Amino acid sequence: MKGLLAKDTTLMSIIILAIILIYASFSWLCPIMIDDYMFWDKYLTANNGSILPSLSGYCNYVRDLWLYENGRLANMLCAPVVLWMPKLAWAIILAVIICAIYLSAASLVNGSRPVSPLLLMSVWICCILLLPWHDYSSLMLIDYALNYFPSTLLTLATIWAAYRIGSGRRFRNARYCLIIFVAFLTGVFHEGFSMPLLAALSVIAATRRFSMPGQW
């Protein structure tokens, strides 16, 4: 986080903690419903009605999703999260992911300058007011959260990496391998995010006549 945040670390820490506590509480208190039970049922069907962890049952679950739903990694992770992960643990993980989304978005907006408390608050408020969290898609449900929040964070990370490489700042080997892994996860996690991102990157490459750095 060095260089990312402004010098007013106390106020920034309070805002970050508030974001995490609010979303962790919201996710923890929100009951499972709708598609949570659908993927729950798919795992039970694939595992002969047993809720217990089973490699063969999970492989059957993944196979059925691949054949009859899609190859989306988020859906493949849904049953393990819903059935086996403590709800409080997932609520905390989800809250950290959401906080990282706000920090990443603020960092992209601010360029190379540190993120100030005011900017982070502004990004947070804009997301609350402008994004459709209040509609009927129930984005705080466990399976919907898996579909959208990790995908958003992975997409922002990939955009940041592409921008950094495109501006001539390359990654060293170890970090570049990590970026490749993140880009791969971005591609397989949710096609609703990865396909538009791929289209945008393709347009950028075409406008530059594909004269991009090798890492790009």
List where the protein language model places each region.
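Start-transfer (signal-anchor) and selected internal transmembrane alpha helices
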Residues: 1-22
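Extracytoplasmic loop-helix module adjacent to an early transmembrane segment
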Residues: 22-67, 79-80, 148
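Loop-to-helix entry region of an early transmembrane alpha helix in multi-pass inner-membrane enzymes
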Residues: 84-100
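Transmembrane-helix motifs of polytopic, lipid-linked glycan transferases
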Residues: 95-114, 157
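Membrane-interface micro-motifs in multi-pass membrane enzymes
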Residues: 118-163, 190
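Short hydrophobic alpha-helices at membrane interfaces in multi-pass membrane enzymes
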Residues: 164-184, 213-216
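Membrane-interface alpha helices of multi-pass inner-membrane proteins
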Residues: 175-191, 197, 202
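Perimembrane helix-loop-helix junctions
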Residues: 196-216
